[in-house]
Amino acid sequence: MTKAIIICDFINEIVSQDGKFKGKGYASFAEQNNVLQNTANALEKARSLNFKVIFVKIGFSADYKEQPKNSLLFGKADQFQALKLDTWATSIVDTLKVE
């Protein structure tokens, strides 16, 4: 059996104090609860045990054609120019060291 660790949505826009989702409180929660370091530690342990590492992230192309317009969380991403793929916003945070 193959084992894996799945890391979801640990992108700058969501968990960084400089991200556009700062007002939602995700970055503050992550900071107050040491989420990034705890996740980095879990990732390091998983790698040492030869787990497959899977990073999943949300993001939209420049024209936002994939954006779910009725989504409570992502419905206004285009208006705020948030979550653009291939930018700092949708890069996995440095703490997690994508390899």
Residue ranges, per PLM feature:
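Gly-rich Lys/Arg/Thr-decorated short loops/hinges at beta-loop-alpha junctions or inter-strand turns
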Residues: 99
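Active-site acidic carboxylates
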Residues: 1-95
